[in-house]
């Protein structure tokens, strides 16, 4: 077992007890998160408008806070993109995931906070890996790196805007390079073909044991890797 695998499995094992507690107490876990979200929401304009400070139950929340579609919530998003602080989240939000509009012609901008990236994506990936490691202790997937094929992002004023995958890659550079390939600079190249060529040059000598990203994108990349190396399989 490699040093990388030993360290990762030790990191995962610390999380197993928490995951087991979530399994055994799902309602309590959700109630605790509900209270946390209320505490955070009270510090915002949104919280003032809907009087989150005095909400004590899910039923009360449902009766006081209306249901939003994107167009209804859009004014909040626009003000956050203008740099206004504590609109719907405490402090300033400077990351925005851009989605292709499915209900209108224009793209939608989804506010993304560092707290959200950490709790939902970074720890979420850790939890998936923790469960996998516990169920398949003999797997060698952690012996190498995960090749992550994401989208791209760019600066729009003071904000960083782009695919959620690119925002996640961009904001987790300080630790993830140890078990993820390619380098961040390569991973967020805007042009797909250029990115794939750079990945071929950079990663064919790496020990890749897992792939992450859109399956069709990965399939196209794998085909190019086979052409690049002259191999018949990976």
PLM regions and their residue ranges:
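Nucleotide 5′-phosphate-binding alpha/beta core
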Residues: 1-98, 104-234
